[in-house]
């Protein structure tokens, strides 16, 4: 079992029950999944770019990503239908908690000029989204072997009903919010 999973069961869940006054343990918000998404627009011109992006994502997430394809053709972007345009990974269970631990304790402090993550990126339904500008903040990526800096989107899906509950949950997981 992951370190953060133990911490959730032993400390975070009881603290949230006390703070919000839940009547049953099933009402306590928890993280259900983390989705990593990387859009690779350069893959339209060069197929090797997609292979490098998939390899980077596999190192970051610890599992093989799914290549996402264009749903319809867009002439302005030179995209045809079913053309590979990105990759994504959905993490659940132990791998999710391991990634969360590495992200909060190792990757976020490596961001240049880091002053905390935005406290406004909630979607109104208890989910949180973070945009990472470059993949080299993750320790699994070797700086010398990176062909291009690529950003990725991290979506944290929770069972929280409100943004306030979600922020309390993520703060308990030691997310460094700035506002």
From Swiss-Prot:
The name on file for this protein is Large ribosomal subunit protein uL5
GO CC aspect terms:
ribonucleoprotein complex; ribosome
What the protein does comes down to: This is one of the proteins that bind and probably mediate the attachment of the 5S RNA into the large ribosomal subunit, where it forms part of the central protuberance. In the 70S ribosome it contacts protein S13 of the 30S subunit (bridge B1b), connecting the 2 subunits; this bridge is implicated in subunit movement. Contacts the P site tRNA; the 5S rRNA and some of its associated proteins might help stabilize positioning of ribosome-bound tRNAs.
The answer to keyword Ribosomal protein applying to this record is yes
Mind listing the UniProt keywords for this protein, alphabetically?
Ribonucleoprotein, Ribosomal protein, RNA-binding, rRNA-binding, tRNA-binding
Species of provenance:
Polaromonas naphthalenivorans (strain CJ2)
Q: Where on the tree of life does the source sit, at the highest rank?
A: Bacteria
Family membership: Belongs to the universal ribosomal protein uL5 family.
Please name the taxonomic classification of the source: Bacteria, Pseudomonadati, Pseudomonadota, Betaproteobacteria, Burkholderiales
Subunit field text = Part of the 50S ribosomal subunit; part of the 5S rRNA/L5/L18/L25 subcomplex. Contacts the 5S rRNA and the P site tRNA. Forms a bridge to the 30S subunit in the 70S ribosome.
Q: Which GO terms describe its molecular function?
A: rRNA binding; structural constituent of ribosome; tRNA binding
**Pfam families in the cross-refs:** Ribosomal_L5, Ribosomal_L5_C
Listed Gene3D superfamilies? 3.30.1440.10
For this chain's UniProt record, which GO biological process terms are given?
translation
């Amino acid at each position: 079992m992951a370190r953060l999973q133990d911490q959730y069961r032993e400390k975070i869940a009881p603290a949230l029950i006390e703070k919000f006054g839940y009547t049953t343990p099933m009402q306590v918000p928890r993280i259900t999944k983390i989705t990593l998404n990387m859009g690779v627009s350069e893959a339209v011109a060069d197929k090797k770019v997609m292979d490098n992006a998939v390899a980077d994502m596999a190192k970051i997430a610890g599992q093989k990503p799914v290549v996402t394809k264009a749903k319809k053709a867009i002439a302005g972007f030179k995209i045809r239908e079913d053309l590979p345009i990105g990759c994504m990974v959905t993490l659940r269970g132990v791998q999710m908690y391991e990634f969360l631990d590495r992200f909060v304790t190792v990757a976020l402090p490596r961001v240049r000029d880091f002053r905390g993550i935005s406290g406004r990126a909630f979607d109104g339904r208890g989910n949180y989204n973070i945009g990472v500008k470059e993949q080299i903040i993750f320790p699994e990526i070797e700086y010398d072997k990176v062909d291009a800096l690529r950003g990725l989107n991290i979506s944290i899906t929770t069972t929280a009903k409100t943004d306030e509950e979600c922020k309390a949950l993520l703060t308990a997981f030691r997310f460094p919010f700035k506002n």
